[in-house]
């Protein structure tokens, strides 16, 4: 499994919105701080909005629009973001209607998929941002 760049962007976008805590954060602000294209930011925010991760706020001028979290980063799991951004299914290329469905290869892929989902569901977005022995997600290695 190879995680797409846009999925990593999604995690960093959530970090920026979370840092805004008591206010909406604009896509322009996120783009400037992260160095990503505004179009890419909006595309990712749209996907996360459609899936209940962020909320879009309309507005102009002083009461400008932007984005806020729909739920806490303590509740948003890696699995949820990866599923939203790209899906998680190791066995996706095996056709369930064919003879592969009953092979050891297929059954092994199903089990691997279940274990991967279990692992990804154990980590939250907050886990990325907390400092530990190796630093936080945003620290340079």
Predicted regions and their residues:
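C-terminal regulatory/oligomerization modules of transcriptional regulators
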Residues: 95-141
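Conserved segment of winged-helix/HTH DNA-binding domains
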Residues: 72-95
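A short alpha-helical element within helix-turn-helix/winged-helix DNA-binding domains
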Residues: 25-35
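Glycine-centered, phosphate/nucleic-acid-interacting loop/turn motifs that mediate DNA/RNA or nucleotide
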Residues: 51-52
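Key DNA-contact positions within bacterial/archaeal DNA-binding proteins
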Residues: 39
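Short helix-capping/hinge SLiMs at alpha-helix to coil transitions
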Residues: 18-22, 71-72
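Short, hydrophobic-biased segments on the C-terminal half of alpha helices
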Residues: 14, 45-46
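Short, Lys/Arg-rich nucleic-acid/phosphate-binding segment
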Residues: 6, 57-67, 71-74
